[in-house]
A protein has these predicted regions:
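Basic, Lys/Arg-enriched alpha-helical interface segments
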Residues: 1-67, 76-80, 87-120
Length: 120
């Protein structure tokens, strides 16, 4: 079974700013997420601390020796929603900056699918 993967506009903006090589590295990990879904664990996926959402995870990508992260959640329909990404090299505050950002994006996403009647 393949798991559904969706992405937000914010993720897409980040993705479009990546080089082709960076996109390839991230795409490999997204492919693993598509294949294994919520069963994918460390070292590829880890739980994010400090999120308002207990199901907030990070996709852990290494590219050219640098750590990239994609924050995502499985929504109530069990689709993986890619929220935001970034290269955390040299940024000790990456999680402090990106987790609240991803929380806001996911809140807005949930409201949108609720309004469309896709979830109760």
């Amino acid at each position: 079974m393949e798991w559904e993967i969706e992405f937000t506009d914010e993720f897409n903006v980040w993705w479009e700013g990546l080089s082709e090589a960076e996109q390839d590295s991230v795409a490999v990990k997204i492919g693993l997420l598509r294949a294994h879904g919520p069963n994918l664990g460390r070292p590829t996926v880890d739980t994010v601390r400090g999120s308002r959402h207990a199901n907030m995870k990070e996709l852990r990508v290494q590219h050219a020796g640098e750590p990239y992260r994609v924050l995502f959640c499985f929504d109530p329909r069990r689709a993986a929603i890619l929220l935001a990404g970034g290269n955390k090299t040299g940024n000790d505050r990456w999680y402090e900056e990106f987790v609240p950002f991803a929380d806001r994006i996911y809140d807005e996403y949930l409201e949108e699918i609720r309004t469309k009647g896709l979830i109760p």
